[in-house]
Amino acid sequence: MVTTTEKTNIGYITQIIGPVLDIEYPSGKMPQIYNALLIRGKNQAGDEVSVTCEVQQLLGDKQVRAVSMSSTDGLVRGMEVIDTGAPISVPVGTITLGRIFNVLGEPVDEKGTVNSETTFPIHRAAPAFTNLETKPSVFETGIKVVDLLTPYRRGGKIGLFGGAGVGKTVIMMELINNIATKHGGVSVFGGVGERTREGNDLYNEMIESNVINKDDPSQSKIALVYGQMNEPPGARMRVGLSALTMAEYFRDVNKQDVLLFIDNIFRFVQAGSEVSALLGRMPSAVGYQPTLGTDVGELQERITSTNEGSITSIQAVYVPADDLTDPAPATTFAHLDGTTVLSRGLAAKGIYPAVDPLGSTSTMLQPGIVGEAHYKTARAVQATLQRYKELQDIIAILGLDELSEDDRLTVARARKIERFLSQPFFVAEVFTGSPGKYVTLEETIKGFNMILSGELDDLPEQAFYLVGNIEEAIAKAEKIKADSK
């Protein structure tokens, strides 16, 4: 949605280079940086066109350089360009829930227009330092492996790493469900430069798992903003800001806890790099834009906790050629509070969520923040799993019987821990037939302590697979015992 004004300030296209346009305005009527410009008229084929651009540079000599948010095909020099006098603005509020928008805040789900009384500009200042929540607090997700080993910070930023088919989407949907049911919060999903098919699949999966209510969108738990792979770089560069702006409304006005998903943060950087050279900037390392740090910082600094609400962000991070030193992921890492790494090995074993307990990290896992009991339990779990990992080669060559008594006990407990880290999800009920479980942090710590202390050494390891709290595992063990008689 773009604020339209009277035709008072009209310029003319002087040059078109792909998605970048040069526009000349009368003397003293130059539009400001980030203003939205509208091109409406007929192209050479006689078809109506409506293109929105955003001012990026003032070139001097009465010219501005702007980046288009949609295809520039058919535009010609001399076409009229109207300065709207304001940045691109998007609709905000509960009216956005259950709907899909593009970068301009226009609905693209064929469900009719969105008549929002309130719109926010996508370029906004980060919250003032005095309004920030400075005391770190843990954001309970109800997912055992996350809460115990990689606790999320309320208002923090978490990187989600994982290849195709290891369960990124399912974890995202479970988090969306849990924040809505347990925290009374909402979510915003920013699809930045990913495949159109994935966006479509995600929408349908959300309808299937009741995250989106198709009949009454206002009962949905999420708003979706898409800027797909096939769209011009201008749209991909700004769609993250459009999603963030919708999330900021829920935080600042509705005073809610918000989850913001960005899939994929790398594509945001990639789009900026595509536009940068066309804007005449000198490329930096590996061909990225020289403003890489600023671009990422402007987005990330707005994702934070205030005294009244929080935006906790989970960002899928694509690592080009698995090179963590590439400037794009390296710049992103500087802003992250934690990483959740999904392991294909665990997914192959059928352990879901397939979060790697040794590869995932969190800055929140400190005794001063989570408490001594939580910290000790988490470190003991990791130490047991690490020892099991070291022993796997010996087991593969010599067999389990060749291990010492202590090591055999460690292996048995590690296998129970590994299985107890799995959990049935609410959003996967449709596929698994098992009812979903939300496990509080207290129950999680209690369960793992009981396994580590040896209290449950006599229970079969399959009793710990896909259960919620430890009481369920004990009940499942009794059922297995009764069935085997």
From Swiss-Prot:
Domain of life: Bacteria
CDD domains referenced in this protein's UniProt entry, alphabetically: ATP-synt_F1_beta_C, ATP-synt_F1_beta_N, F1-ATPase_beta_CD
A GO cellular component entry from the record: proton-transporting ATP synthase complex
First-level EC class: translocase
Catalytic activity, as annotated: ATP + H2O + 4 H(+)(in) = ADP + phosphate + 5 H(+)(out)
Binding residues for ATP: G162, G163, A164, G165, V166, G167, K168, T169
Recorded topology in the membrane: Peripheral membrane protein
Keyword terms: ATP synthesis, ATP-binding, CF(1), Hydrogen ion transport, Ion transport, Membrane, Nucleotide-binding, Thylakoid, Translocase, Transport
Any Pfam family the entry gives: ATP-synt_ab
Major localisation: membrane
GO molecular function term, any single one: ATP binding
Keyword Ion transport belongs to the record: yes
Gene3D superfamilies membership: 2.40.10.170, Bovine Mitochondrial F1-atpase, Atp Synthase Beta Chain, Chain D, domain 3, P-loop containing nucleotide triphosphate hydrolases
Keyword Nucleotide-binding part of the UniProt annotation: yes
Enzyme Commission numbers on file: 7.1.2.2
Subcellular location: Cellular thylakoid membrane
Function comment: Produces ATP from ADP in the presence of a proton gradient across the membrane. The catalytic sites are hosted primarily by the beta subunits.
Subunit structure: F-type ATPases have 2 components, CF(1) - the catalytic core - and CF(0) - the membrane proton channel. CF(1) has five subunits: alpha(3), beta(3), gamma(1), delta(1), epsilon(1). CF(0) has four main subunits: a(1), b(1), b'(1) and c(9-12).
Family (UniProt): Belongs to the ATPase alpha/beta chains family.
Identification of the protein by name: ATP synthase subunit beta
Source organism: Cyanothece sp. (strain PCC 7425 / ATCC 29141)
